Amino acid sequence: MSKIIGIDLGTTNSAVAVLEGGEAKIIANPEGNRTTPSVVSFKNGEIQVGEVAKRQAVTNPNTISSIKRHMGEAGYKVDVEGKSYTPQEVSAMILQYLKGFAEDYLGEKVEKAVITVPAYFNDAQRQATKDAGKIAGLEVERIVNEPTAAALAYGLDKTDKDEKILVFDLGGGTFDVSILELGDGVFDVLSTAGDNNLGGDDFDNKIIDYMVAEFKKENGIDLANDKMALQRLKDAAEKAKKDLSGVTSTQISLPFITAGEAGPLHLEMNLTRAKFDELTSDLVERTKVPVRQALKDAGLNPSEIDEVILVGGSTRIPAVVEAVRKETNKEPNKSVNPDEVVAMGAAIQGGVITGDVKDVVLLDVTPLSLGIETMGGVFTKLIDRNTTIPTSKSQVFSTAADNQPAVDIHVLQGERPMAADNKTLGRFQLTDIPAAPRGVPQIEVSFDIDKNGIVNVRAKDLGTQKEQTITIKSSSGLSDDEIERMVKDAEANAEADKQRKEEVDLRNDADALLFTVDKTLKELEGKVDAEEVKKAEDARDELKAAIEANDIEQMKAKRDSLNEIVQNLTVKLYEQAAQQQAQENPEAAQGGADDVVDADFEEVNGDDK
């Protein structure tokens, strides 16, 4: 069975891992880094992903970051260079890049992946992630919750222990808390809670707002209206946040940030950890609520938790670590790398699927309650949150009016009592209900949640046995035709990227050859026929013309032709050198027979030694 890679598709950074020799191994990107910025940039039709895209964010307005925050969002698109892209398509570009360098590392084609999502992602967001994988040319074998994947990586070598662990996962854009019970190779999720709009980006934004306010106070200029300045502020804020995890004070220096009437202006500021903690105290406070909720849902006290695992780069913030310490009365476990552990867990789950990892069972839960809208706009739950998946549940409903010919099934996800306050997953209709007084028809509504947390709903008239089934497609969901088109676009982009690389390699080859030719012709001056030199010079000029005309086919032909001429000239040069040496030293040319000593070799046996 082919390898299944594990992908942590993050808000700010992504990572890819694979199972080798029973152990999960992170695959480094072409720059040698173990995580890749989840950034995509567009320039003159060329798509770039990762480090190179992030580096040009200041100067290139067509750079997209943190697209994960918009996954599953109805109608959301980004317009770049005259084209519109859905969050699924942008995410697919990141996945395609990760897939590409994973293939280079493995030396084989990769077609299957396990992709992680925040535990608190709803159905629409999970479906969008699966679609992104499909567009990138990946068969998504499983969608795994990030904290669960982290627990899998942490606990794989501890299957003989019985432990209750709390995973605190604060990433770039999302926050999850999951509580799991580990024992005999079973990873049983007891509860999960979270906030899909809380992450490292929010901590950065607090620093940005502070810098903008201070600069305005000093200079009367609002940097919030200057796109290029804002991007520089974002980079500086991220760096300052990271610095303050290790030191208590950091200097922010941004020369020529903007210009005033008197000339250029610079931003110079000292930010202390105490000030940073003050600016972000409300965010740290927000992390405590899901911790308490998860403990309550699991029916546990903090004292019953054996280990606290920190996941996500934002858990390096000292105030966050302190908050976790206080809430759980535990020293967080530092044995896992918060940036890599999720991708490693995904790779392990891939190994479970292929059978390479044995005696491990993963029991995950649905993060939000599921149900339908009933009379009076009430949300009637069929499946409660934190129910182990896969699962299914049925309930019988009836009509609200006499002779009602059809019922509308409005499927929702959430925790609020009224339907309007919850997230709509989809709507469908069961028609041709025979005329009968209200309350007589028996309509059975069944919910089915698969192992990826994706929902199927069925409505059946028990009188006529007529039924209607729907796989939930949210308002942001893509049709099969749309996905097919996007897959073709993604393949075309990959082909275009490959062609572009070949063109660059060809141009580099040609440039190197021109340099070699000039050097060789200089060495051959006066040593070979002028006609031979002229032939080489003509071929060189023809190659230069092909490069200037950007004619790929001509470039290939002229390069090969010039290469042949240069090789012939080089051979002649060596022949001449050999002749010259022979003339200068005739004895050496004759083989120098007198200087050669004949040697007799005799085999020595152990006895003769």
Swiss-Prot record:
Which domain of life does the protein's organism represent? Answer: Bacteria
One family from Pfam that matches here is: HSP70
| Induction cue | By stress conditions e.g. heat shock.
What function does this protein fulfil? Acts as a chaperone.
**Positions of modified residues (Phosphothreonine):** T174
- Protein's name according to its UniProt entry: Chaperone protein DnaK
Record the organism: Enterococcus faecalis (strain ATCC 700802 / V583)
Q: Where is the composition biased (Acidic residues)?
A: 595-609
